[in-house]
Design a protein with these regions (language model features):
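Basic, helix-initiating cap at the start of DNA-binding domains
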Residues: 1-16, 20-32, 54
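Hydrophobic alpha-helical segments that form the core
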Residues: 100, 135-155, 167-176
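HTH DNA-binding helix-turn interface
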Residues: 15-18, 32, 38-50
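Hydrophobic alpha-helical bundle segments that form small-molecule/ligand-binding pockets
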Residues: 89, 103, 115-141
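Hydrophobic alpha-helical connector segments
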Residues: 57-96, 102
């Protein structure tokens, strides 16, 4: 039901605008009460971001599972390249991404959720055996990786989804790769 409710909400947001769509509108369109809506999502914004924490945990687990001795930047590149399509396919198609980019409240929520995701990934990077990464370095690498994903996503949106997102991610990671 969460997935169906999220899809319905997105359709209403696109049709009416985010600000002009209420929780009552979403609930009514789904045949639910407002109270029932809140059993599935704590807020209107969370309809678009409901699975981010679970996804963040899975990405962090993938970081921990990478081969010992692999350079931290290579770990982030490999994991985020692999997960990039799943991260966006989870709930964010082009309509959702455009809605988020054009709605200040949703952009703020996205940044809040991304902060949590970056924290989980940074922690996972530090916890890898033999890395010896300090918090500052892990946070910096993770923030740069997030910037690479953001830039790749924006470029993909600028070209109406016709570019290969994986290639954009590779390009961004190559451009931001730490020097020797």
């Amino acid at each position: 039901m969460r997935t169906e409710l999220a899809e319905l909400a997105l359709a209403l947001f696109v049709e009416r605008g985010y600000e002009d769509t209420t929780v009552e509108d979403i609930a009514a369109a789904a045949g639910l009460s407002k109270r029932s809506f809140f059993r599935y999502f704590p807020s209107k914004e969370d309809v678009l971001f409901g699975d981010v924490e679970d996804l963040a945990d899975r990405v962090a687990d993938a970081v921990r599972a990478r081969p010992a001795g692999e350079e931290p930047w290579a770990v982030l590149h490999a994991v985020l390249r692999e997960w990039e399509a799943r991260i966006h396919a989870a709930q964010w198609d082009m309509a959702a991404l455009r809605l988020i980019e054009s709605t200040p409240a949703l952009r703020a929520r996205l940044h809040q959720r991304r902060d949590g995701m970056r924290d989980r990934i940074s922690t996972a990077l530090r916890e890898r055996p033999g890395t010896g990464l300090d918090t500052f370095t892990a946070d910096l690498l993770t923030a740069c990786a997030a910037a690479a994903i953001d830039a790749a996503t924006r470029e993909w949106l600028r070209h109406d989804g016709t570019d290969d997102r994986g290639e954009l991610v590779d390009r961004a990671f190559t451009m931001l790769a730490p020097g020797p």
